[in-house]
Regions:
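N-terminal Rossmann-fold NAD(P) dinucleotide-binding loop
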Residues: 12-13
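Helix N-cap at the beta1-alpha1 junction of Rossmann-like dinucleotide-binding domains, i.e.
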Residues: 37-41
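Conserved Rossmann-fold cofactor-binding substructure of NAD(P)-dependent oxidoreductases
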Residues: 61-74, 87
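Rossmann-fold NAD(P)-binding glycine/threonine-rich loop
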Residues: 105-141
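C-terminal catalytic/substrate-binding lobe primarily of soluble NAD(P)-dependent oxidoreductases
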Residues: 163-245
Length: 245
């Protein structure tokens, strides 16, 4: 398989490194093109992965024609979107138009209700992609969306629990907390895109309840202290906007 990773930040680098360490029997990943607007960063990651089948390319995720050129040049079969979700629609549509399989870790952006943003849900995260399900199905192509930790693993865990562990479930909450630090750095340590982190905290959180359906609340609503396992301990958590809902 010929793979294009768009974005050589933390997510793209991690994906490339995992591929480089995987067993090579059958060489399922025969070419991995690591691309970024910052070509020097893409080159750095390709070298970290050992070069060879890992190739660096400069790419502009805002430019569909540029992405199509890279896809055609390397005969790409699969695209991993590892950039912030502001670029999702462009990359998603480029893959549809070129017939290339697609995967992302976060979904297309939401839009607030124009009159009651903290009461009524409007365009939710991922709505743009879900609305195009039938179109992708008819084309014979495949898009795996929201395949990160949350969304992604959290949804799988919830479904597994519902199917195999419990007779009934009254409520599902997804809580995310950590205590990681960057050596030598005293500021706040962000685990992924700073812009995305700030936006999901400021946007109206979306909640679904049986009998009520989708609705929104105030940002930073329902604060609570939650004791996380694994030595993390007590962390204050709040409602945020997130795709797994």
């Amino acid at each position: 398989m010929k793979i294009l990773i768009i974005g050589a930040g933390g997510v793209g680098t991690s994906a490339a490194m995992i591929i480089s360490r995987a067993k090579k029997e059958g060489e399922w990943a025969e070419k991995i093109v690591i691309s970024d607007y910052n070509f020097a960063r893409a080159e750095e990651v390709a070298k970290m992965c050992g070069g060879g089948r890992f190739i660096a390319e400069k790419i502009n995720a805002k430019d569909k024609d540029n992405m199509k050129e890279v896809i055609k040049k390397h005969e790409i079969e699969f695209v991993l979107n590892a950039v912030e979700p502001d670029f999702n629609e462009n990359i998603f549509e480029t893959c549809y138009e070129t017939g290339v399989k697609y995967m992302d870790c976060a979904m297309t952006l939401s839009k607030r209700h124009p009159e009651k943003p903290y009461e009524l849900a409007y365009i939710k995260l991922g709505d743009y992609q879900f609305e195009r399900h039938e179109k992708w199905l008819a084309s014979g192509n495949m898009a795996i969306v929201g395949s990160g930790v949350e969304p992604g693993m959290a949804d799988v865990f919830a479904k597994f629990a519902q199917k195999h562990l419990f007779d009934t479930i009254d409520e599902i909450n997804v809580r995310d907390g950590d205590n990681y630090q960057i050596p030598g750095y005293e500021g706040v340590a962000f685990g992924f895109s700073v812009w995305t982190t700030i936006e999901e905290c400021l946007n109206p959180p979306v909640i679904w309840e049986k009998g009520k359906g989708w609705f929104c609340t105030e940002s930073f609503s329902e604060p609570e202290i939650f004791n996380f396992p694994g030595g993390i301990g007590d962390v204050e958590v709040i409602n945020v906007e997130h795709e797994e809902v």
